[in-house]
Every structure is written in C-alpha cells, then in structure tokens.
Amino acid sequence: MIVSALNISEDITVDVDSAEPITQRERDRDYLELKRRVTQAGLLDRQYIYYAWKIPSVIVMVAGSIVVMAMFSGVLWVQLLNAAFLALAFTNLGFLGHDAGHRQMFRKVRQNDWVLLGVGFLTGMTPSWWQDKHNTHHRAPNQMDVDGDIEVSLFAFTEEQALAMKGIGRLTVKHQAVLFYPLLMLTALSLLFGGIAYQIRKERMRYPIAEPVLVVAGLASYLAVIFILLGPWYGAAFIAVHRALGGIYMGSVFAPNHKGMPILEKEDEMDFLHQQVLTARDVQGSPLADFWYGGLNYQIEHHLFPNMPRNNLKSCQVIVRDFCAEKGIPYHETGVWQSHKEILGFLHEVSRPLRQKKA
C-alpha cells in the first residue's frame, strides 16, 4: 500500500509504510474498541435539547437579516454588513443540513430529512446531490479518483493533477496559493449550481418531486425578498456580497479538514480507522472556534463517528486522541492560523512544477 507522505508542516510527515505490519482483523478490532469506549461514554446518544435551541436560533438569524433589509432598505452600508451576516446565517443553516444529513439529530431518517429539505428550501442547496457527494467523500477521504473534494477544476492537490491542467485551470493552479482565498468566493455558487445540474441530469434523488419544488421555490423567494425590499441595484450588491463572503466562509471551514493531509492513490487500501485519522486535521477548539466551524474543527472525530451530534465531538476528541497515542496512530491537531499556513504551503508546493522554467 502506498500513501503519499506529504510534509504538512516542518514537523509532521506521515509515512504509513514504515509502520509495523498489522493484520486487518487487528485494525478492525481497534476501531470496534474505540467505538465501544465512545458508546460507553454516551457520546453517540441523540442531543434533542441541543438541537431544540440550535435550529430555532439559526432561523432567527435569517429572520433578523430580513427585518434589517426592511428597516434599513435605503442604507447601503447597513445592507452590505447585513449581507455578511446573512452569509454567516446561511453557512450555519448548512451546518444544520450537514448534521441532519448524517442523521445526528433524530433517530428516524424521515425526521432528519425534513430538516434537510428545509435547509434546501432556505439555501437553494439540493439535498440528494449534497448527500451523494458528501457520503462518497466520507467513504474514501483524500483518495484519488474517488473523493470528489480533491477533484476540483481550479485547484490541484497532487503534482500529477497540476501538470495535467489545461487552459484557465493551469493558470489558476500555477498561482493557486495566492488565488486560493479569492477563488473561495465561488464556493457558494458552485454548490448551488452543482445541485441544479444534478437535478437537470435527473440523477438519484430521494425526494424527486419535493426537492426540485422546494429548491426552486426557495431561490425564487430569496430573489423576491431581496429585490422587493432593496430594489435592483442594492439588491444586486447584497447578493454579490452575500454569496462571495458565504463562499469564503464555507471554504475556510472546509479547507482545514483535509487539504494538505496525505493523499491516497485509487488502488491503495487502508482500514477505516487509519484512513479517517491520517487524512484529516483537527483545529483546536474553543467556544468561538466550535461555533465558527460548526463542530467540523473536530474533523477526525466526525469522520470516525459521522452520526455523533456535533456538541459531543469535543468530548470525543479526548478519547480518540488518547486512543491514537495508545495505538501509535499519527493524530494531527493545530491552531486556526497554522492550519491555513499548512494549506497554503501545500498548495504552493504542489503547483511548483508549473512555475519552474523549462530547461
């Protein structure tokens, strides 16, 4: 088995091949033991009280933004700040949809689906498309030709990808470390249009009638509210700022999860426990960080236990970190700024061949 050993910082190099051979049965037993400890701690139990206030609080954020639109419709600077606030609210709606998609909220699948459909209506996201894409990522994180999150037209995550780029993609990849954050402004639109394309192709949809109806109705409502309350010019400015900042926010949350961590070839085989831990990065938690990242700063724990309610991930981290130390499994956690430093350094290094002068 070959895993690309990438230097994600000066101190961290992951090389799985150097580890002592362990049988598949032993590795499966390791994960079952970890799951037993986590279950015994009650961390997989549903958190109904948490979501009973979390869901309404995010809806209040959206409603508050609409109120500000109505009350200060003629004040541009207020509306631009309001657009930034709505970007925060919409991303938090996305976090709720993410939780529901992983069945973290309720035991019954349909109840989680109701939340996911509601998020689809409010944000314009197509639930089935997102679940299909995201579940594939969870099954094989950072695995070439499998994980769609490392198959992006404007970025390269291996030197082979960089050298294979053509046209505008080659230009953006050549300077991808510099262009990374500006290009994140396209994230929200990419997610929106990716879902619409999925619907047009009529691919697998859990709710083939409800999803298109809710998404179209939601987008129509979004545009109507903004343009009726703000008018065409202020409305257009509001949407531009909302979508751009929403993209940067989402991208800044998603990127630290796996970017700059080891990448597996398609033919590589790795047990569940090792693949989920070695390809993910945790960002140190705090009340502010936990809110900002929607719990996804505990990415290793989330990948090991996707259906764990997000407010239990911090407690789970203690168990997982100790278990990895016990088993000699590299566990990577860093701060917010260091995580972005690692990402940019990784992107710069991967694209280096495109900047080298030909002999």
What kind of feature is each model-predicted range?
Residues 7-10, 16, 260, 339, ...:
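Conserved catalytic cores of large enzyme domains
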Residues 13-37, 179-190:
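Short, charged cytosolic
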Residues 37-48, 161-169:
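Cytosolic juxtamembrane amphipathic/interface segments immediately preceding
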Residues 7-25, 114-117, 163:
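Short, contiguous pre-domain boundary segments
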Residues 85-204, 265-354:
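Membrane-embedded catalytic scaffold of the fatty acid hydroxylase/desaturase
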Residues 26-35, 60-67, 268-269, 273-287:
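Conserved oxyanion/phosphate-binding beta-strand-loop segments in alpha/beta enzyme cores
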Residues 185, 250-267:
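Transmembrane alpha-helix/helix-exit interface in multi-pass inner-membrane proteins
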Residues 46-93, 120-125, 174-191, 205-253:
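Alpha-helical bilayer-embedded segments of polytopic membrane proteins, i.e.
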